[in-house]
Amino acid sequence: MRKLQSANILAALEAHPAFRAANTILLYHSLGDEVDTHTFIKKWSSEKRILLPVVVGDDLELRIYTGPDDMTTGSYGIEEPTGEVFTDYAAIDFIAVPGVAFDRKGNRLGRGKGYYDRLLPRIPSACKAGICFPFQLVEEVPAESFDIRMDIITVSYTHLRAHE
């Protein structure tokens, strides 16, 4: 069920005009309870520059995905690329953002460590897409004025344009 739902969500994501136009995309290597991105990363790595986050202390460092052979198990049991560090944040066109919950205003609830809260302000011009299963779309997520909202939420077969 998770694999099928993930495939449907990611099919909607890749059909979005902002994704189609993007050259450099920040994805994430999913955990067992998240939308499964493993096959999606491999699929798009031959057509677009794919970046994946690596946990370094209290921050996320971005690295270029070069293939499954260059992955290692990092913090929290997450597979992370060992390739080149990427620091040209202005070149990132699109970001797929994981979360525990999202609301229709684009607010996101993460896992509580603040990694994306610290990363996203460095990438203001990229389209930010929260991707989630239907049960993760909730009425309201608590948000502070400094929280970065998602531009779109991709759930099931469709996108919800985040708005106030």
Predicted regions and their residues:
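Short, structured patches in soluble enzyme cores that scaffold and shape functional sites
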Residues: 54, 64, 80, 132-135, ...
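Active-site beta-strand/loop microenvironment that shapes enzyme catalytic pockets
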Residues: 91-128
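Conserved small/polar residues in nucleotide/adenosyl-binding loops
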Residues: 158-163
